[in-house]
A protein has these predicted regions:
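Short catalytic/metal-binding and nucleic-acid-binding patches
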Residues: 1-174
Length: 174
């Protein structure tokens, strides 16, 4: 009986079966490898201007929140970050701002509307003291363009942690 009602209402499945997603776990002293992908896996980040938009957005969000960005890799349909928020509760705020601001800019640039980014960002955290894991994550992020056989024009990859100490965005290092 109930299934017939849902079939007639064009809902994919009954509402009673929807399970809420688990809240994101963000811990103090952790770094996060974050991936954000374009909606429908479309290749929307191939333009050179995308790099400037990302760098400007990062500079802008750094005035609001304190974090360390160790790596950034812009692929043609997704972006990788290696980031350490100094206040764990700031990570969702940082990512919300970055995704909102870049989506707004890219939609204007590409003369399109609607969602620019696919579902919420993927994050994988590890203790900042785990240097081996950090190096493996950096290798993965910077090896991504090569593994995808991308030209240097289409991919942009950088590490901001090549100095002796990590860059704190509050110090105005960008």
């Amino acid at each position: 009986m109930h299934d017939e009602v849902y079939l007639k209402s064009n809902r994919p499945y009954p509402t009673k079966y929807i399970i809420p997603r688990k809240p994101r776990s963000v811990l103090a002293g952790y770094s996060y490898h974050i991936t954000t992908r374009c909606n429908n896996r479309e290749f929307k980040l191939s333009r050179r201007q995308c790099r400037e938009v990302f760098l400007y957005a990062i500079k802008k969000v750094s005035t609001k929140y304190n974090f360390r960005l160790y790596a950034l890799c812009i692929m043609s349909n997704h972006v990788h970050y290696l980031i350490e928020p100094l206040q764990p509760e700031d990570l969702p705020k940082i990512m919300h701002f970055l995704n909102w601001y870049t989506a707004m800019c890219f939609n204007r640039m590409l003369k399109r509307t609607g969602h620019f980014w696919e579902k919420r960002y993927y994050s994988n955290g590890f203790p900042s003291s785990d240097k081996e894991r950090a190096l493996n994550t950096l290798r993965y992020i910077h090896g991504n363009p090569k593994a995808a056989k991308m030209q240097c024009v289409a991919a942009f990859s950088m590490t901001l942690a090549t100095r002796v100490r990590p860059i704190s965005w509050r110090s105005g290092s960008l």
